[in-house]
Amino acid sequence: MLIALMTILFLGGGGGSSAVMAYFAESQDRVKEVVIDDVRSDEAVDILKSMQGLGKQQNEAWQDVFKELENEFGEHESDEDAIDAIWDDYYRQLREINDEAVELRFELREQLTREEWEQVFN
């Protein structure tokens, strides 16, 4: 389930959607209930908050590219190179966000036992 949500989150352009953000908030609550060790629980919650932050970053990047493209297309003569540069910058940002998301997923996996993982995400 987490992998599917991360895929939607970071590849689907809806990183800041309320449903995805709610999922991360609910996951934080489940971690607090399931993980008895306070140190690991706190670390896992912090990682989930970071993932939630990445979703917000992705949403902001999408909003920015939309505004930039809107401005560029609003020009009488749109510059193809400028449009390509806007998309290139957006995809660069997405790659960075995606790379960080994968790293966070592995960090989260290290904090939870297999049983805890299943209880939190299944």
Regions found by a protein language model. Name each.
Residues 1-3, 7-56:
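Immediate post-signal-peptide N-terminus of mature secreted/exported proteins
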Residues 10, 23-24, 66, 73, ...:
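Phenylalanine-focused residue identity feature
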Residues 26-27, 93, 120:
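Generic signature of intrinsically disordered, low-complexity segments enriched in small/polar residues
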Residues 37-108:
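Amphipathic alpha-helical segments
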Residues 108-122:
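Long amphipathic alpha-helical coiled-coil segments
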